[in-house]
Regions:
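Helix N-cap at the start of a conserved alpha-helix in ABC-type nucleotide-binding domains
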Residues: 66-67
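ABC ATPase nucleotide-binding domain helical subdomain, centered on the C-loop/LSGGQ "ABC signature"
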Residues: 1-29, 73-74, 82, 120
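Catalytic Walker B motif of ABC-type/P-loop ATPase nucleotide-binding domains
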Residues: 55-58
Length: 131
């Protein structure tokens, strides 16, 4: 089903399967019974379930540990192979998902281009702060 697929992409499957009530569990107001990472996974699953042509994610892994984030990146790459995904993040570990990177500083674009070009410019110090 679409719900199971969305849960798989978001990384919720194991958590849901361990819970005695499964998908019928109560999670409380604003997900208060969930960890920060689980709340992010629920939000991601809800977005995936809508199947939008463009998926906008703001700091989608900020509450995830390294292992959880790594598994999420693998699942997202497979799910979003033919979609436009915009990720707003401070985590450089998500750069590998990008075809294009836009770097902003103080509300201004200071770099924009293919991932390899922007990463090279950043590493060589060719990208400065906004003036």
């Amino acid at each position: 089903s679409a719900i199971v697929h969305a849960a798989e992409v978001a990384g919720l499957t194991q958590f849901v399967n361990r819970h005695p009530q499964g998908f019928d569990m109560l999670i409380g107001e604003r997900g208060e019974s969930l960890s920060g990472g689980q709340r992010q996974e629920v939000a991601i699953a809800r977005a995936v379930l809508m199947d939008p042509p463009i998926l906008l994610m703001d700091e989608p892994t900020s509450a995830m540990d390294f292992s959880t984030e790594h598994q999420f990146k693998l699942r997202l790459r497979q799910h979003a192979a033919h979609k436009t995904v915009v990720i707003v993040t401070h985590r450089t570990s998500l750069i590998e998902l990008a075809d294009r990177i836009i770097v902003m500083d103080d509300g201004r674009i200071v770099a924009d281009g293919p991932r390899e070009s922007v990463v090279e410019a950043l590493q060589s110090g060719k990208v400065g702060r906004a003036q």
